[in-house]
């Protein structure tokens, strides 16, 4: 087995794009190594079924999260090129994301067990928070002129990937689902942007669409990075 990578403090957040790719390569390459060498940190000795299931789960989760991010980039780029050129929709746009109150667990380096649980819960909450806007994008908003064929097909892909990734993570970590839902309710992490997207005021409508696609791109980027990080933690216990 290749030696576990070492990250001190939060240095692994440096250069997110390159780091995300590196983590994916580390996770997938070492998962393949586990096919020939027992991974005692994850499964009981000799439990090949458990080992194979975990390999499939982690590889699949990483592929899904990367796919969601790439599709979200495509959606944002398509809208930006068509409707946002020369506009100032980007000003303070990050302040408008409905997931801003969804914070990463603090002091993640101090207790690996709490870190794992906290990050898995955070990932599920992020997925839950995007169910409604993505669903309404492919239903109530699909006939809007701003929702191009590219955006609509990409949104449908994201709905499918979100459901698949959510089910994949919920299956082995079902014990955190209730707490995640409860925390979202208490923090009021919900999306209420439909009215602005249906506004008769074109500039307001375009600003709302820009914010939606910007926030989706931002959040799926985080989702991709931390899904890979959790996978790395579960495999090596220390990344």
Curated annotation (Swiss-Prot):
Protein's cellular compartments: Secreted
Keyword Metal-binding: no
Annotated disulfide bonds: 97-215, 232-239
Entries under PROSITE patterns matching the protein: SOMATOTROPIN_2
GO cellular component, one term: extracellular space
Domain of life according to the entry: Eukaryota
GO terms for MF: hormone activity; prolactin receptor binding
Signal peptide: 1-36
Any GO BP: positive regulation of lactation
Keyword Signal annotated: yes
Pfam family, one: Hormone_1
Positions annotated as glycosylated: 70, 92
Keyword line: Disulfide bond, Glycoprotein, Hormone, Secreted, Signal
Family: Belongs to the somatotropin/prolactin family.
PANTHER family documented for this protein: PROLACTIN, SOMATOTROPIN,PROLACTIN
Protein name: Placental prolactin-related protein 4
């Amino acid at each position: 087995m290749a030696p576990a990578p070492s990250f001190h403090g939060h240095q692994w957040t440096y250069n997110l794009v390159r780091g995300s790719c590196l983590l994916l390569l580390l996770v997938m390459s070492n998962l393949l190594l586990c096919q020939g060498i027992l991974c005692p940190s994850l499964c009981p000795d000799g439990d090949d079924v458990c080992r194979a299931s975990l390999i499939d789960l982690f590889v699949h989760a990483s592929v899904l999260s990367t796919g969601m991010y790439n599709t979200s980039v495509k959606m944002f780029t398509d809208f930006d090129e068509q409707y946002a050129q020369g506009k100032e929709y980007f000003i303070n746009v990050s302040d408008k994301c409905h997931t801003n109150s969804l914070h990463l667990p603090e002091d993640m380096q101090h207790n690996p067990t709490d870190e794992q649980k906290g990050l898995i819960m955070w990932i599920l909450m992020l997925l839950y928070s995007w169910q409604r806007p993505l669903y309404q994008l492919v239903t109530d908003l699909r006939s809007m002129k701003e929702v191009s064929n590219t955006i609509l097909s990409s949104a449908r892909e994201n709905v499918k990937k979100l459901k698949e990734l959510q089910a994949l993570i919920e299956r082995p970590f079902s014990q955190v689902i209730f707490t995640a839902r409860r925390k979202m309710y208490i923090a009021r992490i919900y999306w209420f942007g439909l009215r602005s997207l249906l506004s008769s005021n074109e500039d307001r409508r375009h600003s709302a669409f820009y914010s939606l696609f910007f926030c989706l791109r931002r959040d799926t980027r985080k989702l991709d990075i931390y899904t890979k990080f959790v996978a790395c933690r579960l495999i090596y216990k220390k990344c």
